[in-house]
Amino acid sequence: MDIDPKLILFGDCTYSNLLHHVQLKESGADISFVSPSKFRGTVTAGEVTYNHILQMYPFENVLYKVKLSGREIITYLEEAYSIFGPKVGNQRKLIGSPQNFDCAGGIRYEADLDKPAGKRIKILGFNDGRKFNIDSVYSVAMVSYRANGGGELMMKATGLQAEELGSRVIEKYSDVRELLFKFFLSGRSLKKLEEN
């Protein structure tokens, strides 16, 4: 099964499913946020080496677990999906950087890009059947770049300044590339991951 990071902008893909799986499994968080990679290529099916992981995920990011309210999670996703502009013909233009896009794992949600900003995201519930409550506080797995204010999504979601975001960190884990390498060393199949 091929891994193509740019497909993340179009919905579920192997790349986002892999990162969500790794982040949720390592952290035990309720929700996972992941973003596209700058990698412009595909890791083809077959044996995956550490070099493939460096190509697919070139960033030095540590996995963080942070706390966000349900309302902040919706605001975060609203900000992430704000990179999509209106449709021109049958194509939707990007009005923001794809690097400032995140998608969520661990929850079922709809993103209606034809709705106005602030009304695009509807969270239906958790993958495990739990209900999502905007007033509850949840644990969210994300990379250190985002947790420390990269792309400003955390600041816009919480209303905090970058230097205040440390108050939201619950725990820090290993480098994401190491976690990906561990996944492939375990012999897990991407196909089985896609089926779950």
Residue map of PLM features:
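Catalytic centers of hydrolytic enzymes
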Residues: M1-N196
